[in-house]
Swiss-Prot record:
Heterotetramer of two alpha chains and two beta chains. Pfam families: Globin. One of its GO terms (biological process) is hydrogen peroxide catabolic process. Red blood cells. This is Hemoglobin subunit beta. The keyword Iron applies.
């Protein structure tokens, strides 16, 4: 994947302002609420019976932070995303059996969360760069499935 200097700047510039704990928790909670079938991968998280329960669930919050922290590795390694996510791809494929479509869904949700948090800065150019990034990350995570 080729990244222009502008794309790299738009991604890293915004990432430096992201509150990983808050945005990660919100992104995972939204995934579980908007796409309820994804909840089956989180049965050990306890109460996921309503949007309020999901948003207030400390395990959702903690895992959301973990997911977005991991996503930050893509930002740091834009030129080597495939290798950066090789082990996570293996884990999600072989052990967790996560449908790779869920990676794309979470990427789309992350775009919505970033747009909500950074409305003015999240210009169409910024969105295009981030959309490209979430697609590349989703593809890297799905790599083991192919």
């Amino acid at each position: 994947v080729h990244w222009s200097a502008e794309e790299k700047q738009l991604i890293t510039g915004l990432w430096g302002k992201v509150n990983v704990a808050d945005c990660g928790a919100e992104a995972l909670a939204r995934l579980l609420i908007v796409y309820p079938w994804t909840q089956r991968f989180f049965s050990s998280f306890g109460n996921l019976s309503s949007p309020t329960a999901i948003i207030g669930n400390p395990m959702v919050r903690a895992h959301g932070k973990k997911v977005l922290t991991s996503f930050g590795e893509a930002v740091k390694n834009l030129d080597n995303i495939k290798n950066t996510f090789a082990q996570l791809s293996e884990l999600h494929c072989d052990k967790l059996h996560v449908d790779p479509e869920n990676f794309r869904l979470l990427g789309d949700i992350l775009i919505i969360v970033l747009a909500a948090h950074f409305a003015k800065e999240f210009t169409p150019d910024c969105q295009a760069a981030w959309q490209k990034l979430v697609r590349v990350v989703a593809h890297a995570l799905a790599r083991k499935y192919h």
